[in-house]
Amino acid sequence: MKITTTILFIGLFLTGCVDDVPRDNPLDPESAGYKKEGSVNGRIIIANQSSGISGAVVRNSNESVSVTTDSSGHFSFLKLSEGKHSFIVTKQNFTNDTFNVSVQSGSASQIVRGLNGAPIVTFQQILTRKIDQYFPSPQYFVDVTASVSDPNGIADLDSVWFGVDSLKYPLTYSVTTKNFHATIYKYDLPTNTIQYLVGRPLTVISRDVNKAVNISAPFFITRVIENEASPISPSPFVDDTVSADSLMFKWSPPNVTYNYSYTLSLSRVDAGTQTVVWSLIGLNSSNESYDFYTHPGRPMLLPGSYVWTVSVVDDFGNYGRSKESAFVIK
């Protein structure tokens, strides 16, 4: 009994001698310096995919602070005050995204957000065409080609147009070439001439199913070929009947100073319908004639009616084609 009383006395004595424990630890909820803070960790990905988006800017609107996602799309905000926080995500060629997070004291919120990417034009080209003819007048048109992709997948693409000034012309997708294409004739343009396009900035406009729009960097027409080569022989004005074993194409060259090559084309005519039976591309501009029977793998030409043409093609791919020259194989 005496031992128990002694221990109790000592305990009471020590308790009375010890001051209150200081509470200045900022991690101690009872401390005056304690701050109710949490964190937000997240990842920005391409919508409908698992690929992270690097270089996206995530901004905390409450505290006016921003971070940039790493190569895998991850980001972190530390020491955020407890409560609701608003964020906005921006990235070039992606639709902005906003979201809210309720930050809890002492905890880390995990967030994953998917961004919708606008379409991307990876290739764009416009080539001019002139088709000379006896009647009614030369035909002029342009071929527009564009390659367009979408970060969210090709199925996300909705529409693609060729744009000039306030005008838009729809482009059609080709399964064969995997490109979008349109042929625009001079009568489709305000001045009834493709010269209307010369010097004007041209664009490809694309839109996805979520209505995100991309307008390409401007591109321009390089040249309209007005001076084409002229067939000399065979010709209905010289000798329209040719032996099957002596077909020699002759023409006069164009009066131009730029680099170019020739394309020759031969078609058979049956009841007014033309069928291309032979062509030669990339013939050097130094040539002014070509012996058909020296061409490897040439087709056998049966007796009948034919027409041939010679086109001038510049280094960009623009071309001007001659009038058709008719003849007969006997």
Residue ranges and their predicted role:
Residues 29-54, 151-152, 315-318:
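Structural motif
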Residues 63-74, 173:
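Short, acidic Ser/Thr/Gly-rich low-complexity loop/linker segments typical of extracellular
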Residues 92-115:
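Structured interaction patches on ligand/partner-binding surfaces of diverse proteins
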Residues 20-26, 115-137, 219-247, 252:
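Short, compositionally biased P/S/T/A/G/V-rich stretches that sit at domain boundaries
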Residues 144-155, 210, 251-258, 314:
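Extracellular acidic, Ser/Thr/Pro-rich low-complexity tracts
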Residues 42, 69-77, 178-180:
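Glycine-centered loop-to-beta-strand initiation motif
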Residues 76-84, 92-93:
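Short Pro-Gly-centered beta-turn/loop motif in secreted/extracellular proteins
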Residues 43, 56-68:
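Short amphipathic beta-strand segments in non-cytosolic proteins
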